[in-house]
Design a protein with these regions (language model features):
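Conserved beta-strand hairpin/beta-sheet module of binuclear metal-dependent hydrolase folds
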Residues: 1-58, 138-151
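Active-site HxH/HxHxD metal-binding segment of metal-dependent hydrolases
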Residues: 21, 42-123, 283, 289-290
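Aromatic/hydrophobic pocket-lining residues that form the small-molecule binding cavity
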Residues: 76, 168, 248
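Short hydrophobic/aromatic-enriched beta-strand-loop microsegments
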Residues: 87-94, 149-151, 238-240
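Short, solvent-exposed loop/turn segments at secondary-structure boundaries
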Residues: 102-106, 159-163, 197-198, 239-242
């Protein structure tokens, strides 16, 4: 999908309720010249198939540089694969390096606020530090074409999770002030063709949510973030409750830092024993292996069904009936 003169999008369908509609992989650069990819999806086969298939069918070239908007695995999961199979140089957010331990090649470049990636053909990609969703969140901007790559700082079909609300609000206002902003390419969801309106909507939404939280607290008595979340999101998909609670806690932290709410410290549970942690890790490993094996068997079954329709019924007939005109 062509976004601008230098930008193409590979939109991969995603069933995760946290990732509405699509997960976006973006290719930047003049076709036939050096290319940069921003985010490359989770370490799952279908992301790799989509990207390799697109490169083979449309780009007919390989990736020179692969980078990411932040460390979360649905954006960084294929960095080792991009290095090994696409032979790409890898660039990551500088302060995301410790968060990517074990998931990146041994040799990587790092990016920080103010850096510029210069590609062949005069394409200049600005690097913008936009913490808030995560501590290492970056956005990338091609000012000449007005194209912003927002990662999970803004999504195409919903609001995002926020780890540091004060930083996030500053990041939104910074993006709102970008010159020549025309289109936004989010980490998940549809391409945004009204980016300034969407940014302002995000700012307004966070202000609205803060006021709703204050309204609940004005009811009197100490209350947990979870109970506040249940009041604010009564009909939310249950699979998204913890994400919603995380955002409520981000609001409460900012309110506490500003001296507007009092915090009664909770009582944490005792840490799990090393043996229990190891059992849980092994359970997850065995479960994931079983799921992977099940998917393989499902693929084999599907292929067998296709073959059964493509070929004559040799399982029924050693010598099938034959027919001749009388």
């Amino acid at each position: 999908m062509k976004i601008s003169e230098s930008v193409r999008a590979v939109l991969v369908a995603d069933e995760n309720p946290m990732h509405p509609d699509f997960t976006g992989i973006y290719l930047i650069g003049k076709q036939g010249r050096q290319s940069l990819t921003i985010d490359s999806g989770e370490a799952l086969d279908h992301y790799q198939w989509f990207l390799r298939g697109y490169l083979a069918a449309v780009e007919r070239e390989e990736i020179a540089i692969a980078t990411i908007t932040h460390h979360h695995s649905d954006h960084s999961g294929n960095l080792k694969w991009a290095k090994e199979f696409l032979k790409a140089d890898i660039s990551i957010p500088a302060n995301g390096r410790p968060l990517l331990k074990g998931r990146i090649p041994s040799k990587v470049d790092t990016l920080k606020d103010g850096d510029v990636i210069d590609l062949d053909g005069g394409v200049r990609v600005q690097v913008l530090a936009t913490p808030g969703h995560s501590v290492d969140s970056l956005c990338f901007y091609i000012e000449e074409e007005g194209v912003l790559f927002s990662g999970d700082t803004l999504l195409g079909s919903s609001t995002t999770t926020v780890s540091d609300l004060a930083a996030y609000r500053k990041s939104l206002k910074r993006l709102l002030d970008l010159p020549n902003l025309k289109v936004m390419c989010p980490g998940h969801g549809k391409i945004i063709n009204d980016p300034r309106e969407r940014l302002q909507m995000y700012i307004n939404h966070r202000d609205m949510r803060e006021q709703q939280i204050l309204n609940v607290l004005e009811g009197g008595g100490a209350i947990s973030s979870w109970d506040i979340m249940l009041q604010l999101y009564p009909d939310i998909d249950k699979r998204l409750r913890r994400a919603a609670d995380s955002n409520v806690r981000s609001h409460l932290k900012q309110l506490a830092d500003e001296g507007r709410v009092k915090v009664y410290e909770g009582t944490p549970r005792k840490p799990k024993s090393a043996a229990r942690v190891q059992r849980e890790v092994e359970h997850v490993r065995q479960r994931d292996l079983a799921i992977k094996h099940g998917r393989k068997l499902e693929a084999e079954r599907s292929r067998a069904e296709v073959r059964a329709q493509e070929n004559p019924p040799t399982s029924d007939w050693k010598e099938p009936p034959r027919f001749e005109l009388l």
